[in-house]
Design a protein with these regions (language model features):
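ALDH superfamily catalytic-core signature
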Residues: 211-360, 422
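Structural signal for hydrophobic packing residues in well-ordered secondary-structure cores
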Residues: 39, 43, 58-65, 69, ...
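N-terminal Rossmann-like NAD(P)+-binding subdomain of aldehyde/semialdehyde dehydrogenases
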Residues: 1-115
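Hydrophobic packing residues within well-ordered alpha-helices of enzyme cores
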Residues: 94, 166-169, 173, 195, ...
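Rossmann-like NAD(P) dinucleotide-binding subdomain of oxidoreductase/dehydrogenase enzymes
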Residues: 106-248, 379
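Residue-level signal for inorganic ion chemistry
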Residues: 14-16, 50, 72, 94, ...
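Short, well-ordered beta-strand elements within core beta-sheets of diverse protein domains
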Residues: 18-23, 38-44, 129, 238-241, ...
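Conserved C-terminal structural/oligomerization subdomain of aldehyde/semialdehyde dehydrogenase
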Residues: 12-19, 201, 338-341, 345-465
């Protein structure tokens, strides 16, 4: 750390380290001022004009796709095959967002009143997008596109744990957009706080932890006209019914808990398992998990990369040392692992818990794990599974594994989640649909046309014929 830079060491010390410029309060204010100055001109463009400029951004991103994918892997440890999928999803968001904007952002005629009327969807102003490290392009990019297409300007703050990715992404966007329309703001939490609390910023999209999301809600409570979209993660559950395809369920659970080393808001961190098929399912799960052996994330065959940082590695070790139940897959670090040289690689871990009260009081229940750790609980009857699911305060995703249509409908109707799946991993989240949670998982919907609702404010227009 120097007076002018903030040093960051990535997941594999000695491989990629860098220093990004420290942002002063004056720098943040200057970025906000440029964003505010650019807003009226950008908002005055037609939808077609904004879409045309954003299409150029899409062309730029496509041209840089492989370069950015490799950078994502080197900077965060995400396996290269996942990083490429992230870039493909980000590029696909252009067409999805354009199609949704065409349907939703046009003036809407409303009949049946005393006068001719329409609803106009108006931009809010400068918008802050706070992006996480685990999907350093894809997650912030979806909100960014929606805000920009709707006529807002964007102040983009990437995670400092993926600052290089954020820089290249910003360069791609800025190359096609007028000055001030897309501003890059690098820095740690105080920078994000200043950005979000500035009264000139009229919308905030934050992806991150529950404590920070709640703190933002409290801090912005008095500025009730500011739009706040929160995507705060989850404790995502797979419910395995007695008639489930167990091989399919085991592979889906293994994928859900291990993709991105469990560092996904929608990662599978819990299984509710019917007693009659428990032994068979757990045997299949252990076999499926053998696919996920930590290895070099730049290797095309690697499925499980490292955790992002030493602090995440330490937290993983603390969690698997708990006494909540029987660790049927014990997890741990690689025997050859040297934290100072080879990165923060860990093994998948599975704990079978019989004492639900002890579990509910433990960090395994109260906090996002953000590591490949799975809690398994046994149930005998459907109502018991539903009660146990609803005992936890998160509500992002859940998946029900059953061959019965009625069982899926019956159980699913009683689960408080924003995303419900059948016979799919909890990590399944196509960009065509709203993505977001209930309860502690937030209020944002950064997917499908739903996020456009956060990007605009409605104006009812009537006139005397």
């Amino acid at each position: 750390m120097s007076a002018d830079t903030c040093d960051w060491q990535n997941f594999s010390p000695g491989d990629l380290s860098y220093a990004f410029p420290m942002i002063s309060s004056g720098d943040v204010s200057a970025s906000i001022a440029r964003s505010s100055q650019a807003f009226p001109t950008w908002a005055a463009l037609s939808l077609e004009e904004r879409r045309g400029l954003l299409s150029q951004c899409g062309d730029n991103l496509r041209a840089k796709s492989e370069e950015i994918a490799v950078l994502i892997t080197r900077e965060t440890g995400k396996p290269i095959r996942e990083a490429r999928l992230e870039m493909a999803a980000a590029i696909a968001k252009f067409d999805f967002t354009f199609a949704d904007g065409e349907r939703f952002l046009r003036d809407e005629a409303v009949a049946g009143g005393p006068h001719p009327a329409l609803v106009r969807h108006c931009p809010r102003g400068p918008a802050a997008v706070i992006s996480p490290f685990n999907f350093p392009v894809h997650l912030g990019h979806g909100a960014t596109l929606a805000y920009l297409l709707a006529g807002n300007t964007v102040l983009f703050k990437p995670s400092p744990m993926a600052a290089n990715v954020g820089l290249v992404y910003a360069q791609v966007m800025q190359a096609a957009l007028p000055a001030g329309v897309f501003e890059l703001v690098q820095g740690w939490a105080p920078v994000g706080q200043e950005l979000c609390l500035d009264p000139v910023v009229r919308a905030v999209c934050f992806t991150g932890s529950v404590p920070v999301g709640k703190a933002l809600s409290v801090a912005l409570a008095s500025d009730y006209s500011k739009s706040l979209a929160l995507e705060l993660g989850g404790k995502n559950t797979a419910i395995i019914c007695e008639d489930a395809d167990l091989a399919l369920a085991a592979d889906a659970v293994a994928d859900g808990m291990c993709l991105t080393a469990g560092q996904r808001c929608n990662a599978t961190s819990r299984v509710l398992l019917h007693r009659s098929i428990a032994d068979r399912f757990l045997d299949l799960l252990q076999s499926s998990l053998k696919r996920y052996r930590p290895a070099d994330p730049l290797d095309e065959t690697t499925l499980l990369g490292p955790l992002i940082h030493f602090s995440a590695h330490e937290r993983y070790e603390q969690l698997i040392s708990g006494s909540e139940g029987e660790w049927i897959v014990p997890g741990g670090i690689l025997e050859c692992n040297d934290k100072e040289q080879h990165g923060f690689y860990v093994l998948p871990a599975v704990v079978l818990v019989n004492d639900s009260a002890a579990l509910d009081a433990s960090p395994l229940a109260k906090c996002e794990t953000f590591a490949p750790i799975l809690v398994v609980e046994i149930f005998d009857k459907e109502p018991e599974a539903i009660t146990r699911h609803e005992a936890w305060a998160f509500g992002l995703t859940a998946s029900i594994f059953t061959s019965c249509d009625d069982a899926f409908s019956r159980i699913g109707a009683l689960l408080s989640v924003g995303n419900l799946y059948r016979n799919l991993p909890t990590t399944f989240s196509p960009s065509t649909l709203p993505f977001g949670g209930w309860g502690n998982s937030g209020n944002g919907r950064p997917g499908g046309r739903s996020f456009l609702r956060f990007a605009v404010q409605e104006q009812a227009v009537q006139w005397k014929a």
